[in-house]
């Protein structure tokens, strides 16, 4: 993984999704040493999945990036995540919301898969009415599919939900379907494999 390769791929993704979409580099499988390559490549926003990894990486490269949290948010880690990131993409519990002090996107489970985090859509309205933190939008993770078009109905449904509640930000789309997500109104896409190649997810 060289800075030149990452920069080329990063710029390609940015060109594909357009100026209104923020490309978040997913760093779950990026080592501490490799983060320096991302910084050298000009990556601006990174998304971390685990609070402990966020703490470790932020301690070394805190000023090099804007930090987002994109993994499942445990209530007991919410304050730690708040101290280190500017936006949480994955809020889905009242207990975590009470401890969070940075803006968030509510994660919605549109597929009904038990393996996926997120609120069921029928609970979204009540959650938004009582949520004590600033909610800027919604996020979702559709079922994995080889064909990106299979993700489109989920992205469209999320956009319609956001419009219903007057929310502007949409975090949806990963390496295999970010182009479709952008077409359906994503304002954040999370990419890993696309930036780093086959050895990273």
Where are these regions (language model features)?
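Short alpha-helix boundary/capping motifs
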Residues: 66-67, 189-191
């Amino acid at each position: 993984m060289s800075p030149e390769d990452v920069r080329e791929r990063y710029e390609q993704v940015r060109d594909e999704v357009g100026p209104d979409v923020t490309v978040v580099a997913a760093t779950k499988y990026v080592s501490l040493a490799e983060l320096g390559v991302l910084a050298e490549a000009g990556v601006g926003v990174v998304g971390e999945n685990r609070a402990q990894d966020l703490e470790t990486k932020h301690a070394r490269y805190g000023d090099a990036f804007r930090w987002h949290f994109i993994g499942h948010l445990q209530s007991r880690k919410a304050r730690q995540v708040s101290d280190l990131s500017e936006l949480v993409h994955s809020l889905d519990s009242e207990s975590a919301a009470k401890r969070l002090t940075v803006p968030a996107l509510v994660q919605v489970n549109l597929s009904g898969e038990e393996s996926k985090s997120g609120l069921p859509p029928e609970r979204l309205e009540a959650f938004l009415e009582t949520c004590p933190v600033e909610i800027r939008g919604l996020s979702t993770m559709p079922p994995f599919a080889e064909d990106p078009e299979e993700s489109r109905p989920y992205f469209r449904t999320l956009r319609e939900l956001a419009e219903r509640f007057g929310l502007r930000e949409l975090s949806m789309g990963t390496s295999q379907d970010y182009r479709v997500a952008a077409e359906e109104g994503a304002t954040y896409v999370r990419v890993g494999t696309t930036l780093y190649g086959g050895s990273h997810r």
